[in-house]
Amino acid sequence: MVQKKSQSSKTVTVEQIGSPIRNSQIQRATLKGLGLNKMHRRRVLEDTLCVRGMIAKVQHLVRVIDES
């Protein structure tokens, strides 16, 4: 069954501020999973526990810009 997204779903804006060079493959894959692949790129993501966990794993490489 397909679930529809509600209009009031929370989002979080994330910006990549660090380079994945000299970081582990897991951290590179986490950045790719967040949709970030180049410096200073921003993504608006749904605010879920999974996304928050991914942000926590690469907290030295990303910055949370906006939580709405």
Curated annotation (Swiss-Prot):
Q: What is this protein called?
A: Large ribosomal subunit protein uL30
One Gene Ontology term of the biological-process aspect is: translation
**Lineage top rank: taxon:** Bacteria
* Record's keyword annotation contains Signal: no
- Family annotation (HAMAP family): Ribosomal_uL30_B
SUPFAM superfamilies documented for this protein: Ribosomal protein L30p/L7e (SSF55129)
Signal peptide boundaries: none
**Complex formation:** Part of the 50S ribosomal subunit.
- Name the gene: rpmD
- GO cellular component entries: cytosolic large ribosomal subunit
InterPro entries assigned to the protein according to its UniProt record, in alphabetical order: Ribo_uL30_ferredoxin-like_sf, Ribosomal_uL30_bac-type, Ribosomal_uL30_ferredoxin-like
- Which keywords describe this protein according to UniProt? Ribonucleoprotein, Ribosomal protein
Q: What organism is listed for this UniProt entry?
A: Bartonella henselae (strain ATCC 49882 / DSM 28221 / CCUG 30454 / Houston 1) (Rochalimaea henselae)
Taxonomic lineage of the native organism: Bacteria, Pseudomonadati, Pseudomonadota, Alphaproteobacteria, Hyphomicrobiales
Under the heading CDD domains, the entry gives:
Ribosomal_L30
Q: Does the keyword Ribonucleoprotein apply?
A: yes
The Swiss-Prot or TrEMBL record describes its family as follows: Belongs to the universal ribosomal protein uL30 family.
Provide a Gene Ontology MF annotation, just one.
structural constituent of ribosome
**A UniProt-annotated Pfam family:** Ribosomal_L30
